[in-house]
Curated annotation (Swiss-Prot):
This is Cationic amino acid transporter 7, chloroplastic. Belongs to the amino acid-polyamine-organocation (APC) superfamily. Cationic amino acid transporter (CAT) (TC 2.A.3.3) family. The chain crosses the membrane at residues 62-82, 90-110, 131-151, 185-205, 214-234, 254-274, 293-313, 346-366, 396-416, 417-437, 449-469, 480-500, 508-528, 540-560. It holds the Pfam family AA_permease_C. It comes from Arabidopsis thaliana. The gene is CAT7.
Amino acid sequence: MEAQYRNHDGDTSFSSLRVYLNSLSDTPSRFSRRAVSVSTSYDEMSRVRAVSGEQMRRTLRWYDLIGLGIGGMIGAGVFVTTGRASRLYAGPSIVVSYAIAGLCALLSAFCYTEFAVHLPVAGGAFSYIRITFGEFPAFITGANLIMDYVLSNAAVSRGFTAYLGSAFGISTSEWRFIVSGLPNGFNEIDPIAVIVVLAVTFVICYSTRESSKVNMVLTALHIAFIVFVIVMGFSKGDVKNLTRPDNPENPSGFFPFGVSGVFNGAAMVYLSYIGYDAVSTMAEEVKDPVKDIPMGISGSVAIVIVLYCLMAISMSMLLPYDLIDAEAPYSAAFSKSEGWEWVTRVVGIGASFGILTSLIVAMLGQARYMCVIGRSRVVPIWFAKVHPKTSTPVNASAFLGIFTAVLALFTDLNVLLNLVSIGTLFVFYMVANAVIFRRYVTVGYTEPWPTLSFLCLFSITSILFTLVWQLAPSGPPKWFILGASTVTAIAIVQIFHCVVPQARIPEFWGVPLMPWTPCVSIFLNIFLLGSLDAPSYIRFGFFSGLVVLVYVFYSVHASYDAEGDGSLDFKDVESLERINRVLS
């Protein structure tokens, strides 16, 4: 068994059908050995990283990260989300919703920042969860995150066709054609979306530094168009619209839907801040991770908060909230005003730039996730290779780019959008839990059960709050349960904070107000997960089931073989001492 276990090719289990069948019979023991096996920070930055062959060049600075963060967050969706949340949930107080959502996004970004500073590798959340909870949880979350990236990128690229048509006054149908033999939802061919995806794929394969430069130019143009729309909104707007609806029978005031409306609006617009997580995957290519990563991630979120709040105020001043078009607020508002119809095309141009920037950042991120998952051997090692000339993960970039292009060619936008979001929120939830666990538990030295019990109790309390908020009818019983849940959650955090000491204090940068900051992030992500529809959970369950099958029939055996040949083993005493210095 030991001879079979050790093979320098790393694929002993797949050398023949007979050997593979024998390996399957040993799946339970291999699963128990590998599923919760944690890597170390030093291994991730040295031995595992070396699997790629070449190193990714460290060419990025803090301003590159800020540009990538802004480009990843501010896509075309902001032109729609603001109007929808204002009309349906918050009214003029949508600016408060954006501020609350932005603060919560900043708290979640802090969790990513602590990990990225102390573990500057390209794996992002996959690596963070792998060194905390083990290989199997990391693979489940990483695979779902990559699928969400691919699906959202395909949807965004098809949206580019629509906004480009709006900018030039051309109907989308003139750029797409119908194939009668294909089923509905998959029969509208979009060649422009394919061209855009393949062009972005070429750029990110060629050079990360050049990709950053392209993103900086497009982001600057996009921000210029956003500022233009904001100025137009303020100049044409009326302060009275912040408190008076068009129909006197509708609720009035700055908070027409009350506090609940503000928080419901915050839950909707929070997704507009998603994108900063992709910046963490660039950590391996940052010149000075300790200084540049905190400035890049936090700085980009702060700038986006300001832009979103200004857009929300200008939108609320432009029209009474009950006249806002939920689907195309800015375009509809300006098109109804004599002499201002041309602004509609400006919105289309700005949205087109936003789509390109979000596509560049997301495709950079998805390729680096796949690259590091390949390094861990749970997918073929081919994905881990870094090209010696470009210093980019060309194999992962090209494969995912082609896959995205195929989806964008055939699949309708609505079909894609119904499959996106839950995976990203789930990963945010896992990272917030992981940063607490890493602070309070040192494997082999600290008892993990107090921390695990705390995380479970806090999550259960947050789930109870979310279910009551979503399902219970309004009235005193609902508010009593919500209040009791809030008090219980606060008490749980305070008791944990007082009773359980931190096992590790970050040397360079750490999440402030531990454990309160990540706990707010945990609660928010559970709250947002509770607002998603049933098809989202069905998709998540179905795809997660497929991921489990892949892990059972392939990944656990490939990982087991890699452990046998020493790729994932760790026994060097000198290296152990270096780990202690890194993690102290």
